[in-house]
Amino acid sequence: MVDQNRAFGWAANDESGVLSPFHFSRRENGENDVTVKILFCGVCHSDLHTIKNHWGFSRYPIIPGHEIVGIATKVGKNVTKFKEGDRVGVGVIIGSCQSCESCNQDLENYCPKVVFTYNSRSSDGTRNQGGYSDVIVVDHRFVLSIPDGLPSDSGAPLLCAGITVYSPMKYYGMTKESGKRLGVNGLGGLGHIAVKIGKAFGLRVTVISRSSEKEREAIDRLGADSFLVTTDSQKMKEAVGTMDFIIDTVSAEHALLPLFSLLKVSGKLVALGLLEKPLDLPIFPLVLGRKMVGGSQIGGMKETQEMLEFCAKHKIVSDIELIKMSDINSAMDRLVKSDVRYRFVIDVANSLLPESSAEILTEHVDHGVSITSRF
């Protein structure tokens, strides 16, 4: 009889971040669970940071991936929202306490006991592994319905990148009045989605970048209204005080002062890029211009479902490069160089093939340790 708990994926075993085949176990499908056969999984920049331990809290082995689209193959007896055969998604979080102030406000992403899809532990102590694998078992409250008309492959990155830009647009008032001016700093995996969603909300969008390399693409294909090169001092001077909002997606070290100068009085800058080192925060421009700096971390489950419906309605998807699982390490190398337009997505179902040289991951919940062995 086939072991229904067996799973297969690609894991990083140390800070080199090199991914290799792994066999491991998923928990049995419980009464509140949905088992998902993974079809596609997006490659997020945070996957790269985590497998290389850039943030200092990685626990190996790690199977990354939190932009998952697949098919429900089993549902628990208490699950009424989903049925076998449904197309579903799993994003950045797969658990929370369900009782704190944040959870009661549909902000599970800010729950102090939030459980992430990978490099995290569930309440029973088991290590969670992500979507660079063939199957995942998730509490139904953290499973999303993929709307008709939203492609499985190019829709997958919306489960992280999409909600990461959608949520702050709603919270910081960017959607209340069309015609407001939004600056998007950085045109990468987050930035190109921010342009599309911003335009769908009726904003006038300016892409802010260090070079003019992507100018025509940003305007002609992505729909941006204008393009501002930060190294062009004359254009930067002309743009002072013209923007109501800026979404800063850049995860590399950069100066905030030039961005503050672009904001109108009472303008808002929302930082989304997760940097390894803190940025300098100039206070004078904030005080003298009543300007605001804020942050945002993905979104709750209700808002994420809302975002998916919004993107389906407006035909918003990520621009992707579809890759095989065996190409993941070279894709990570390219991601470091920003050599992708604009998101890698792994064709899991058609390329994840077991190998006889793979390792077995055995998890010992009682002691909270993992032991690997060859087979």
UniProtKB/Swiss-Prot annotation:
Catalyses: (E)-cinnamyl alcohol + NADP(+) = (E)-cinnamaldehyde + NADPH + H(+); (E)-coniferol + NADP(+) = (E)-coniferaldehyde + NADPH + H(+); (E)-sinapyl alcohol + NADP(+) = (E)-sinapaldehyde + NADPH + H(+); (E)-4-coumaroyl alcohol + NADP(+) = (E)-4-coumaraldehyde + NADPH + H(+)
The tissues in which it is expressed are: Expressed in the root tips. Expressed in the apical meristematic regions, leaf veins and at the base of the trichomes. Expressed at the base of the stems. Expressed in the abscission zones of newly formed siliques.
User: What are the entry keywords?
Assistant: Lignin biosynthesis, Metal-binding, NADP, Oxidoreductase, Zinc
| Residue numbers binding Zn(2+) 1 | 44, 66-67, 160
Q: List residues binding Zn(2+) 2.
A: 97, 100, 103, 111
Listed under GO biological process in this entry are: lignin biosynthetic process
User: Which prosthetic group or cofactor does it need?
Assistant: Zn(2+)
The record's InterPro entries line, in alphabetical order, gives: ADH-like_C (IPR013149), ADH-like_N (IPR013154), ADH_Zn_CS (IPR002328), CAD-like (IPR047109), GroES-like_sf (IPR011032), NAD(P)-bd_dom_sf (IPR036291), PKS_ER (IPR020843)
- Which amino acid positions bind NADP(+), per UniProt? 46, 164, 186-191, 209-214, 249, 273, 296-298
Per the record, the pathway is: Aromatic compound metabolism; phenylpropanoid biosynthesis
Signal peptide coordinates? none
Pfam families for this protein: ADH_N, ADH_zinc_N
Cofactor notes: Binds 2 Zn(2+) ions per subunit.
Q: What is its EC number?
A: 1.1.1.195
Q: Which family does it belong to?
A: Belongs to the zinc-containing alcohol dehydrogenase family.
Alphabetical list of PANTHER family matching this protein = ALDEHYDE REDUCTASE
Q: What is the role of the protein in this entry?
A: Involved in lignin biosynthesis. Catalyzes the final step specific for the production of lignin monomers. Catalyzes the NADPH-dependent reduction of coniferaldehyde, 5-hydroxyconiferaldehyde, sinapaldehyde, 4-coumaraldehyde and caffeyl aldehyde to their respective alcohols.
Q: What interactions and quaternary structure are annotated?
A: Homodimer.
Protein name in UniProt: Cinnamyl alcohol dehydrogenase 3
